[in-house]
């Protein structure tokens, strides 16, 4: 029996910008709202920067800080008017991650829902990939 072949054609497209279909990091509406609120009080800053540091009982921990500019090797995520910069060292650890902001009666914090994490410590502040 003869096998069928599907024909494929490739066309060059000019004047079209290719955009990634998925950002390294996505933000929930509550994270966007909180970042906007925080930046309102920091007019000299243009966004927040996410980094990763070696610490804790599982090895790595995320850091968040205000930033006045994009670093040379930072990846920029823009969502709903909010700019988040990802340090080079953190870029691979954040692929596919959702950044959320959670507030309850006792605490409020940014939470990184990361599908790549293999393990976390009991308090949830450090992780390994």
From Swiss-Prot:
Its Gene Ontology cellular component terms are: cytoplasm; mitochondrion
Mitochondrion as UniProt keyword: yes
Q: What is its main location?
A: mitochondrion
Q: Which InterPro entries is this protein grouped with?
A: Fe-S_cluster_asmbl/transfer, FeS_biogenesis, FeS_cluster_insertion, FeS_cluster_insertion_CS, HesB-like_dom_sf
Show the SUPFAM superfamilies listed in the entry: HesB-like domain
Transit peptide range?
A: 1-12
Q: What Gene3D superfamilies does this protein map onto?
A: HesB-like domain
Residues the record lists as binding Fe cation = 57, 121, 123
Q: Per UniProt, which keywords does this protein have?
A: Iron, Iron-sulfur, Metal-binding, Mitochondrion, Transit peptide
What is any one GO biological process for this UniProt entry?
A: iron-sulfur cluster assembly
Q: Which GO terms describe its molecular function?
A: 2 iron, 2 sulfur cluster binding; metal ion binding
| Role of this protein | Involved in the maturation of mitochondrial 4Fe-4S proteins functioning late in the iron-sulfur cluster assembly pathway. Probably involved in the binding of an intermediate of Fe/S cluster assembly.
Give the family per the record: Belongs to the HesB/IscA family.
Protein name in the entry: Iron-sulfur cluster assembly 1 homolog, mitochondrial
Q: Which organism is it from?
A: Gallus gallus
Gene for this chain: ISCA1
């Amino acid at each position: 029996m003869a096998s069928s072949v599907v024909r494929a054609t490739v066309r060059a497209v000019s004047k079209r910008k290719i955009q990634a279909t998925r950002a390294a990091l996505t933000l929930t509406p509550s994270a966007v709202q909180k970042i906007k609120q925080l930046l309102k009080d920091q007019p000299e800053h243009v966004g927040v920067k996410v980094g990763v540091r070696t610490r804790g009982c599982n090895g790595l921990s995320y850091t968040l800080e205000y930033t006045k500019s994009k670093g040379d090797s930072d990846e920029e995520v823009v969502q709903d008017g909010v700019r988040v910069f990802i340090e080079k060292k953190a870029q691979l650890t954040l692929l596919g991650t959702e950044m959320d902001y959670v507030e309850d009666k006792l605490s409020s914090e940014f939470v990184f829902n990361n599908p790549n994490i293999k393990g976390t410590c009991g308090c949830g502040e450090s992780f390994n990939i």
